[in-house]
Amino acid sequence: MKVNIYLETDKQNQECTWRKYGYVLEAMAGRCIPVTRVGFGSAEGTYHKCNLQALEEALVRFHKECEVCVYTKDAFVAARILKIDEMAATDFKDTKGKPIKNAKEWESICRKIKECSIVISAHSGKHTYSVWMQEEMKKDGGDMGKGMEPETRTEPG
């Protein structure tokens, strides 16, 4: 099965700040209309950390082997996800032996990829759900909560 994960945050600056984030899972099963699942949350963190947190939350929903393509405006996360095996080989440490930034999130993502035998790819830039996700994050004012939003949320598309 082919699954696309679309990531978005409400702020794209690099500073550590409170921000909203979200993901859309889009599963392609044969010729059927894609099935989507949505999750939103909020946390204090950097742009990269919140994108990784959204990806982590999306991957929790996976239980079997599949192909996953991650779409995000975060070019760093898109590039590094392709090198996750290299990061794991160094135990998520830099050349000085110190843990890389967001090591906990990278380790969790790597564990899930291995556990489910996920074949991963990534694209950086604006994506199909960017505008919709930004609108949803604005609608909810200051408090997005954590994880999946209620059934009353409008569906993407």
Language-model segments: which ranges?
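RNase H-like nuclease fold core
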Residues: M1-Q53, R61, Q134, D143-G147, ...
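RNase H catalytic domain
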Residues: T9-E15, L55, L59-E135
